[in-house]
């Protein structure tokens, strides 16, 4: 199902091989899992804060560190996704050019 979503996002004019789509899907699943975990962390942080119990407030320090590390991981995953997408588009356009679809017209000076 998620692969279908990625295919729809790519549009009908772009062809990508299954391995590339699997890589994108894997990255998106990783991001979603981290974001889901972050939601749980934020809820726990809020509950601890509202309780004002010293032990719970102390626990928030570690939870906030974990949250920050997770945000950093998501940012890195998105950078990797962006780089992989750019590389796949470059490879796709190079393939189009080598197949004769990239014919250029020479304009007079």
Curated annotation (Swiss-Prot):
It comes from the Eukaryota. Residues 88-109 are annotated as: Disordered. One of its GO terms (molecular function) is protein homodimerization activity. InterPro entries: EARLY_FLOWERING_4, EARLY_FLOWERING_4_dom. GO terms for biological process: positive regulation of circadian rhythm; rhythmic process. It is found in: Nucleus. Homodimer. Component of the central CCA1/LHY-TOC1 feedback loop in the circadian clock that promotes clock accuracy and is required for sustained rhythms in the absence of daily light/dark cycles. PANTHER family: PROTEIN ELF4-LIKE 3 (PTHR33469:SF38), PROTEIN ELF4-LIKE 4 (PTHR33469). Belongs to the EARLY FLOWERING 4 family. This is Protein ELF4-LIKE 3. It comes from Arabidopsis thaliana (Mouse-ear cress).
């Amino acid at each position: 199902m998620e692969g279908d979503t990625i295919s729809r996002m790519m549009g009908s004019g772009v062809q990508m091989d299954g391995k590339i789509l699997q890589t994108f899907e894997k990255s998106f699943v990783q991001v979603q899992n981290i974001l889901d975990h972050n939601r749980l962390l934020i809820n726990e942080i809020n509950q601890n804060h509202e309780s004002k119990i010293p032990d719970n407030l102390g626990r928030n320090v570690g939870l906030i560190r974990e949250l920050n590390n997770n945000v950093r991981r998501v940012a890195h995953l998105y950078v990797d996704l962006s780089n992989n997408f750019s590389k796949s588009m470059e490879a796709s356009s190079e393939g189009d050019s080598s197949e004769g679809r990239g014919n250029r017209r020479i304009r007079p000076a």
